[in-house]
């Protein structure tokens, strides 16, 4: 196991996402090419709380999946750094998810991703989202990449 601390700038150098759609604040653990653990701190003023739900804010499940998917991209980057450096387009081919408990303002969302099988342009990743010891969601992703042509790469 490797204890690490990647800040938001390091994360932005890997993920194509930006605020308000960047759902990883830090990476706290990397275990070789097997596991990545990341954190999203859920703030009171997150824009999605305005409508989901007024007076009883709950993080939408689809955004928990997005956070787990972003952690999975970081795992992919660690497994395939040379391919990842070409800034490919990432996509989810299949998602199987289960939601177990709500995520609310003030929660520290821990995102664990496990490499089931990552090959050149695709992978299968198991993901778990938790707050403390409470599991809030589980997912299995089949993800893929589409290589960009040199003129398509965003700088």
Task: Explain the meaning of each model-derived region.
Residues 1-29, 155:
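N-terminal leader/capping segments at the start of a protein or of a new domain
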Residues 21-23, 109-110, 123:
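Hydrophobic core residues within well-ordered beta-strands of beta-rich domains
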Residues 19-59:
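Catalytic strand-loop segment that frames the active site of acyl-thioester-processing enzymes
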Residues 3, 104-107, 115-155:
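HotDog/MaoC-like acyl-thioester-processing domains
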Residues 2-5, 72-110, 136-144:
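Hydrophobic beta-strand-centered segment that forms part of the acyl-chain substrate-binding groove
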Residues 50-74, 91-92:
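Compact, glycine-rich, soluble single-domain proteins
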Residues 25-28, 100, 112-116:
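Conserved positions in beta-strands of structured domains
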Residues 12, 55, 98-101:
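Beta-strand-rich interaction surfaces with strong enrichment in secreted/lumenal proteins
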């Amino acid at each position: 196991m490797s204890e690490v601390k990647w800040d938001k700038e390091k994360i932005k150098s890997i993920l194509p996402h930006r605020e308000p759609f960047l759902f990883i604040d830090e990476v706290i653990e990397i275990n070789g090419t097997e596991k990545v653990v990341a954190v999203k701190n859920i703030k009171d003023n997150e824009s999605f709380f305005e409508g989901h739900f007024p007076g009883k804010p709950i993080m939408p499940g689809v955004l928990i999946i997005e956070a787990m998917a972003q952690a999975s991209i970081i795992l992919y980057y660690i497994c395939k750094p040379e391919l990842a450096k070409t800034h490919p387009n990432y996509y989810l081919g299949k998602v199987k998810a289960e939601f177990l408990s709500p995520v609310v303002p003030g929660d520290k969302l821990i995102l664990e991703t496990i490499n089931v099988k990552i090959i050149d342009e695709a992978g299968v990743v198991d993901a778990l989202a938790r707050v403390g010891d409470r599991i809030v969601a589980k997912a299995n992703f089949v993800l893929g990449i589409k290589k960009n042509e040199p003129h398509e790469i965003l700088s």
